[in-house]
Amino acid sequence: MKLWGGRFKGEENKLMEDFNSSLSFDKRLYKEDILGSKAHVKMLGNCNILKDYEVEEIIKGLDSILKDIEDDKLKIQGEYEDIHSFIESNLIQRIGDVGKKLHTARSRNDQVAVDFKLYAKNISLKIIESIETLQNTIKNLAEKNNVIMPGYTHLQRAQVVTFKHHIMAYYNMLKRDKKRIENSIENMDESPLGCCALAGTTYETDRKFTAKKLGFRKEVDNFLDGVSDRDFVIEFISDFSIIMMHLSRLSEELILWSSKEFDFIEISDEFSTGSSIMPQKKNPDAAELIRGKTGRVYGDLIAILTVMKGIPLAYNKDMQEDKESFFDASDTVLSCIKVMEGMLSSLKVKKGNTLRAVKMGFLNATESADYLVLKGVPFRDAHKIIGEIVLYCEEKDKSIEELNINELKKFSTFFNEDIYEFIDYENALNRGIKKEIK
């Protein structure tokens, strides 16, 4: 059954039917579509547009459709244009002509907008929950591994940090990610139901009722904007893209750290794979896939931005292309967060190796300069002196702490025996605001 056709003489080409149909992907909106329809029909009853018994029959029919779909008795398939026509057609088959009254004072334009907003809100709340679970895992991993390791700039060993402080940086990134999604939910939390095609309706409907019934903060202010707004899709996918960027950065570090060149961590067998030809290989494929899927979500963002960039008000069929990008992006980010959480929950930190790496990279050079500054040497002069000491150490294959006091005094008479305690790697984290790192 088509929801349109009275003004057409010719039949729709089968090629066009298939090309036009969105049922294959928008079928996942079935719950939201039924929920929106129930709120709409209750409003029609409250406004005396439909009789009470008609409202009851329609709601009963919608509930039976939902139950049959959930029980796998009703398959969402067939030659339907979309999920809306699938549900309405099945409703009419079950309850007869009264089912044809469901769409009174409603267009598919406001119908799909409210369905999509409800779905986007629900999946985004699930993503927030998964972020919180990942944050807890990161926090537990950090508390169990408060050991020193090299901190890097330009991927070169720079200064001493702790594994705890390093991994907690991602906790804070996820904190911002969560806030961004919450802000996006706040921005989109207005109901478009009742806007109809673009200009409202001549019926005295109650948009406040349906907005409240469906859990929206309020109804939209402008009918045209209500049906043609897809900012929420763009905002959410933008949020998801930033999450993926953070997960990709963490994945990159896990990949590096698990390599023999670093050997700081071991990713469990559960989240690794092997090689079909090289028996010794243990590959960090989970992390690599997260890193790779980041580009996929970026592509979804560019896709929806491109779809929306040249569309006049109000609804245009181009907007049918909004859903697959969102579905793909939300599915991808949710699965990546869950995989990252599993990977981190079983991660082993090789504490001895992180300590050895600290001792190999002159990571107490800045502290050595600070020592001279505290003795009265201007920082720029201290910086130059320590640079010369590092060059000397490289030539002698020694670390700064391995130089005896006489060697150090060749570079500056301000050095005394207390230098060794001052530049000890653990001690360095007990001074100044560095204490916050621990």
From Swiss-Prot:
Pfam families cross-referenced by the UniProt entry: ASL_C2, Lyase_1
GO cellular component terms attached to this protein's record: cytosol
Major enzyme class: lyase
GO-annotated biological processes: arginine biosynthetic process via ornithine; L-arginine biosynthetic process
Annotated GO MF terms: argininosuccinate lyase activity
Substrates-to-products reaction catalysed: 2-(N(omega)-L-arginino)succinate = fumarate + L-arginine
InterPro entries, per the entry: Arg_succ_lyase_C, Argininosuccinate_lyase, Fumarase/histidase_N, Fumarate_lyase_CS, Fumarate_lyase_fam, Fumarate_lyase_N, L-Aspartase-like
Matching PROSITE patterns: FUMARATE_LYASES
Subcellular compartments: Cytoplasm
Listed EC numbers: 4.3.2.1
Main location: cytoplasm
Sections of the chain in a coiled coil: none
Biological pathway: Amino-acid biosynthesis; L-arginine biosynthesis; L-arginine from L-ornithine and carbamoyl phosphate: step 3/3
Listed Gene3D superfamilies: Fumarase/aspartase (C-terminal domain), Fumarase/aspartase (Central domain), Fumarase/aspartase (N-terminal domain)
Source domain of life: Bacteria
Family label: Belongs to the lyase 1 family. Argininosuccinate lyase subfamily.
Protein's UniProt name: Argininosuccinate lyase
Organism encoding this protein: Clostridium tetani (strain Massachusetts / E88)
